[in-house]
Amino acid sequence: MRIIRTKAGGKQPSAFKNCVAEDKEKELNYCFDRKEVKDHGEGGLFVGKQLVDGEKVIIIEDVMTSGKALREILPKLEAAANVNVVGMIISVDRQEKALNSDLSAVSEAKKEFGIDVYSVVTMNDIIAAIEDGVVDGKEHLPAMYNYRATYGAK
């Protein structure tokens, strides 16, 4: 199985890889994409183990807003190898409308690409945690409610 991160920033994918591999006692490889193809050094569009035809891939992303990052990475994956994207894991689902749709970006990913997206936390979870006093931030709730009313999926 291959883990693809769509951004090089933040925690390195190896931390996630090691956590999953220890739990399942399997070797997992990972790579991440570059903004543009590099023609020197390691070269190529992906850094890390190169993609192989028939390989299963999980995409890791920090946040899903409109689904734009997923739409950008899929053609890159298709150009690199004939892989099978079996899912996507995101830290935060902002529960925002997808591009040109009233569906959430997560629902649109399933409908359009057949990809299940799993989130660690949703915008509703964050709002509920603030409302319940689990985390600070009550002063931000009016802006969050307004944001959700304006951009939130139906």
Task: Describe every region a protein language model picked out.
Residues M1, E27-N29, N84-G87:
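Residue-level recognition of the N-termini of beta-strands and the immediately preceding loop/turn
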Residues M1-K7:
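Short glycine-rich phosphate-binding loop at a beta-alpha junction
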Residues S14-V57, K68-E72:
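Short, glycine/charge-rich flexible loops or terminal/linker lids adjacent to PRPP-binding catalytic cores
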Residues D33-E36, D62, V92, V120:
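Fold-independent oxyanion-binding glycine-rich loops
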Residues K38-E42, S66-K68, E96-A98, I127-A128:
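Short, well-ordered, mixed-charge alpha-helical segments that flank or form enzyme active sites
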Residues F46-D93:
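A contiguous pocket-lining binding segment that forms or flanks enzyme active sites
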Residues P75-K154:
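PRPP-dependent phosphoribosyltransferase catalytic core
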